[in-house]
Amino acid sequence: MTTPSHLSDRYELGEILGFGGMSEVHLARDLRLHRDVAVKVLRADLARDPSFYLRFRREAQNAAALNHPAIVAVYDTGEAETPAGPLPYIVMEYVDGVTLRDIVHTEGPMTPKRAIEVIADACQALNFSHQNGIIHRDVKPANIMISATNAVKVMDFGIARAIADSGNSVTQTAAVIGTAQYLSPEQARGDSVDARSDVYSLGCVLYEVLTGEPPFTGDSPVSVAYQHVREDPIPPSARHEGLSADLDAVVLKALAKNPENRYQTAAEMRADLVRVHNGEPPEAPKVLTDAERTSLLSSAAGNLSGPRTDPLPRQDLDDTDRDRSIGSVGRWVAVVAVLAVLTVVVTIAINTFGGITRDVQVPDVRGQSSADAIATLQNRGFKIRTLQKPDSTIPPDHVIGTDPAANTSVSAGDEITVNVSTGPEQREIPDVSTLTYAEAVKKLTAAGFGRFKQANSPSTPELVGKVIGTNPPANQTSAITNVVIIIVGSGPATKDIPDVAGQTVDVAQKNLNVYGFTKFSQASVDSPRPAGEVTGTNPPAGTTVPVDSVIELQVSKGNQFVMPDLSGMFWVDAEPRLRALGWTGMLDKGADVDAGGSQHNRVVYQNPPAGTGVNRDGIITLRFGQ
């Protein structure tokens, strides 16, 4: 299935502006309102997948509910009917601009002032979204645009969820491999998320626009996700010169691992950004520099040593006291020695035999993306082995289950096999051409497919009621859960012949081409029309015929004139009039007719009748009154 060039007879699609994980965005023209728009269309290969179809519709619902100047507006939604089924689309405001990702990649880090202004506007957009019950869940530089007028626009609520539905992991609705650098720790663990998760992701974006790189990078999404959960970010000022400690404080508070330690709303984060922009200290705690940290530790160490005291005066001991003192010291030395030996023995035992193992319950990671599931299991101390399997119910790169199974108690450090879905089993579509629909269903069922839909399409007469193709096509692999559209021949397409009388042959043929007719013949006919002009067709205009029919164009010889009304005229007046029209033929004067005295010698009968075509060299019959 391909994307049509027009949607709902209103939107004319133009160039592709970009691609997403499940859609493509076109520049389009709204033919009704005469304005440019951006149209997001679900990828044709995903349109038949119910999970992607529902997710795309959820994006439309979420985005349409958000009317804010810093959020890309949604104008319309709909579904285009195609031979393969409905194709959903979203019509959005067209923003002529660039994304933060493109700006950082081409121009490098922003100035602190500009970065604060941009992210503060993004905070307003997200706060509005959160107040309306929608968490974005995929905040990243590629989803924030700067328009040609420097307006900030947050877009792509493709995996957004209502807050009431946020108990599900982000990865239960979309793979996050492409956005691992902006995941919150709770997203990386597969825990439930709330508005503070968007705050963390926006903190990652602020970090990147200030320094030119995200807070965490790695060789794989799993390693990046692990850092989000376990590692502290390097302060931005240590990555890029010219950044203040106050700006460090705002960024690092947004990037707090524990959501309770972050800004609780995007509005709080914006308020601190405004303070820093105005030269005021933020409410976020200041981050100590290395020098300040060293000075503080040195001061603390000095306080722990305590005030200096003078030594006690030495006292002389007698022999008994001296022996008692020596004996006491000896006993304490022995005790300390024994404890030291025990410590060494216990340490060796732990290192040698692994110490006391503890049982850990295997978490339930079914339905999570493989990256999130692996991070969750590794955080529990498990070793991981992955095994890929086809599955009709779990999306690709998401977890089918684990071995041992979820909620099983195992020893910490054990190996867990993570069964990762490759999606529904793929099989080859057999060729069912020329079969009946029932025969085609039987053959496709034997090949492992189980969902079918019939579509009719014009065909040659001999293929009426026979299969002329499938979608997906024969010999192409497809998921066994996909609907196979069986296209049955309905015979030649039919059209009504339009009226082309009065047109030249070339113009008439072009107009007939518009209706689908391509086969023509010509016949010269007597006609008063100018020579070469079409007088009609055979079959006549208005007749419904197959589009592959031969249409005969009847072309005027230009050899006739229209017979005038000669009634009541004397012959001496009638003849010049006929000659003036080009008549060169003979007069057939019939017997006079008794028509009363007033009609004496006047025309009382003519053949051909008035208004009909007469050959210029033809015979005209007239009768006169007596």
From Swiss-Prot:
Signal peptide: none annotated. Interaction of the PASTA domains with peptidoglycan leads to septal and polar localization of PknB, and dimerization of the intracellular kinase domain. Dimerization activates the kinase domain via an allosteric mechanism, triggering autophosphorylation and phosphorylation of target proteins. Inhibited by mitoxantrone. Inhibition prevents mycobacterial growth. Keywords: Acetylation, ATP-binding, Cell membrane, Kinase, Magnesium, Membrane, Metal-binding, Nucleotide-binding, Phosphoprotein, Repeat, Serine/threonine-protein kinase, Transferase, Transmembrane, Transmembrane helix, Virulence. ATP binds at residues 17-25, 40, 93-95, 140-143, 156. InterPro entries: Kinase-like_dom_sf, PASTA_dom, Prot_kinase_dom, Protein_kinase_ATP_BS, Ser/Thr_kinase_AS. Residues 299-323 are annotated as: Disordered. It is a single-pass membrane protein. Residues 356-422, 423-490, 491-557, 558-626 form the PASTA domain. PROSITE patterns: PASTA (PS51178), PROTEIN_KINASE_ATP (PS00107), PROTEIN_KINASE_DOM (PS50011), PROTEIN_KINASE_ST (PS00108). Residues 311-323 have a biased composition (Basic and acidic residues). The active site is at D138. The modification Phosphoserine is found at S166, S169, S295. Protein kinase that regulates many aspects of mycobacterial physiology, and is critical for growth in vitro and survival of the pathogen in the host. Is a key component of a signal transduction pathway that regulates cell growth, cell shape and cell division via phosphorylation of target proteins such as GarA, GlmU, PapA5, FhaB (Rv0019c), FhaA (Rv0020c), MviN, PstP, EmbR, Rv1422, Rv1747, RseA and RmlA. Also catalyzes the phosphorylation of the core proteasome alpha-subunit (PrcA), and thereby regulates the proteolytic activity of the proteasome. The intracellular kinase domain and all four extracytoplasmic PASTA domains are essential for PknB function and cell survival. The PASTA domains interact with peptidoglycans and are required for PknB localization. This is Serine/threonine-protein kinase PknB. It comes from Mycobacterium tuberculosis (strain ATCC 25618 / H37Rv).
